[in-house]
Amino acid sequence: MSEQLTFHFEVDGDNFTSAGQASVMMKKNLRQLGISPDTIRRVSIAMYEGEINMVIHAGGGAADVTVDEEGVKIVLEDQGPGIKDIEQAMQEGFSTAPDNIRSLGFGAGMGLPNMKRYTDTMEIESTPGVGTRITMRVNF
């Protein structure tokens, strides 16, 4: 691929019905581009986890995805409450999701750890009261 392709998705907040639509659409786009199934799987998992986090914690946000010769870059950005302690939030099982969200089967504290696990690089910038920006990359 000699060119760079970009995709933009809005993520609705507090809407579990539409949660995951961006990752499903991106999965289709990557298949059409002939990207390997393993890369598609990794991108889909990381994006889905990020979307769910934006729905649960931030009232929505945006996902911007760039596909270039080297891989897939995913930028998730929201204007939610921010992450107070990123190191703690990265611990498997740590969650600030309320009980009503947990009763739906979400909020198990695996979102951020899974995002890191399935990407080659992940960087989190967050300011409490302002929002969060997560940049991930999955290399080919």
What are these regions (language model features)?
Residues M1-F9, E51-F140:
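Conserved beta-strand-loop-beta-strand hairpin that lines the nucleotide-binding pocket
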Residues S44-Y48, I52:
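Short acidic amphipathic alpha-helix that forms the conserved interface helix of the HATPase_c
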Residues M1-I45:
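Bergerat-fold GHKL ATPase/HATPase_c domain
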